From Swiss-Prot:
This is Neutral protease 2 homolog UREG_01255. Secreted metalloproteinase that allows assimilation of proteinaceous substrates. Shows high activities on basic nuclear substrates such as histone and protamine. Zn(2+) binds at residues 311, 315, 326. One of its GO terms (cellular component) is extracellular region. It is an enzyme of class 3 (hydrolase). Its main location: secreted. PANTHER family: NEUTRAL PROTEASE 2-RELATED, PTHR37016.
Amino acid sequence: MYIRSALLALAALAGQALAFPLNSLPERDNAGLDIQLSSTGNTRVKAVITNNGDEAMSFVKFNTLFDSSMVRKVKISKDGSAVPFTGIFGYYDINNLPKEAFATLSPGASLEAEFDIAETADLSEGGSFKVSADGLLPIAATKGSTKVDGAIQFKSNELTIDIDGDEAAKVHASVMSTLGKRSRVDGRTCQGRAGQIIVNSLRSCVGYAQAAAQGAANGDAQKFQEYFKTTSPQVRQNVARRFQAIAQECSSPSQGRSIVFCQDVYGYCQRGLIAYTVFANSHVATCPDFYRLPARVNQGLGPDHGYVMVHELTHAPAVFSPYTQDYAYGYQQCRRLNAQQSLGNADNYSLFAAAVARGA
């Protein structure tokens, strides 16, 4: 784990979206919800959601088609094979979302968003690609509420797009070039208080990950079953290895396979986003809301700084493979995932680590 800053000297003195593409979260009747995709030019796609129901609907925009960040919005395939995603994975506290995280649609109203799918996927091969979106749209209990109490399952139409590979390559290369430049940010982002907070966050991450590794390998089988829906010895050992890799990464602030930034060096932060991981280079950036979280939570399953670091590093392919997705957030939603989904969902790991370390 590299921390980009003058923090390296400090560490030596001191000693680390919503993509809800699943069908097992609490669902509501999806009658009246319509999502249509259309091609607007080479790799640009427009999504339109329409509420054809009789009541207003408030849904979460984060990690969906209507998130302005480079999160996974659609599924892309070519010749039957999925095209890998290369964007960002963000962490949000699903139980503490700001009002601007939601959009409200009155009956008959529509909302649209346009994005470039080449920003988060390498489509330079060109030719015919299939593009679609499906999953669950998290919804609020009532209009104007910020409490998520369910989700509406949706499935868009499927597009077949003939893509100019050279033009797609330019879009993707531009994004990758930006990431490359950012990886050489100087030591200004982690000075002072922010730097000390990150040092302490990494220490907390080590504690969580080490406890979770022990719990996964040799701990209570029922506790493991609660979070990962299996007690397979092979699966338990593999989960333990992931936690061991995270513990090692968080214990090495001056070396390692990832970099933590104390500021939003990529410009993806928005209110409600706590931190994010850039898939392409396993960089973790913290947002202002990260510093509003408690440094340490000793009871329950709420997020703190170490919790978030564990969550983000499960996304980092340089730390452990396969990397995780953001299928669901928070205990109530994560508990409804099946075994395969749970093992691939970042927050299940943070929740398990918190449960073991805090005795929750």
